[in-house]
Amino acid sequence: MRIRTEEKIKPTNAELKKILNIGIKLSTEKNRDHLLAFILESGMDITHCDASTLYLFEDGKLHFKIMKTLSQNISRGVEGEPIDNMPPVPMTERNVCSYAALHREIINIPDVYDNTRFDFSGPKKYDALTGYHTQSLLVIPIENNEEELIGVLQLLNAMDETGKVIPFDAEYEIIIRSLGAQAAIEITNLKYVQEVKRQLRSFV
């Protein structure tokens, strides 16, 4: 397991162009649900991974907001619809996403089946039921510019050009965290605008 907080990166020109385009899109998207879906899909695209889950931090817990697995054609919550039968994740040290949120740290695990630091009984149970195989994992806490926790992005099973599952390259960690921070600012701004509109309506 690697827990990282800072590292220099040297993206290729193509990757840099993609990142800049994503940044522009993040700054112009005004629909909250579309923005959240774009965060998840951008993270998957940049890291070339098969699956991802986006959690939002509300009421002291991490709530499932969006889940997507390409190889199984699974897409839930993308249009803002609630994800049923998925209880909130409590903030405990043994849960990898909760740990990342509590300590505001990036967590990069090459193979969850070799890791004993965190409790992966949930993913292992899912694998046993569905035939999926969770292997590599990258967890990024999402904070706004006031260091408020907005949520957590969990990316699963990075793949090489042949489709083989590989560990997540460390160079993507800061890229994803930076995009997450920008997205968090936009989410906070949208929340502020909605609150102002609500207050204005209360005076009418």
Q: Can you describe what each PLM-predicted range is?
A:
Residues 1-6, 102-106, 174-196:
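Signal-transmission/dimerization alpha-helices at domain junctions
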Residues 3, 133, 148-150, 156-179:
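Regulatory loop-to-helix N-cap segments in sensory/regulatory domains
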Residues 23-30, 39-48, 54-56, 101, ...:
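Short regulatory alpha-helical segment in sensory/regulatory domains of signaling proteins that mediates
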Residues 28-32, 36, 93, 169-172:
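The cytosolic transmitter module of two-component sensor histidine kinases
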Residues 41, 53-92, 105-107, 114-115, ...:
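GAF sensory/regulatory domain recognition
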Residues 105, 110-136, 158-167:
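Signal-transducing coupling segments at domain and membrane junctions
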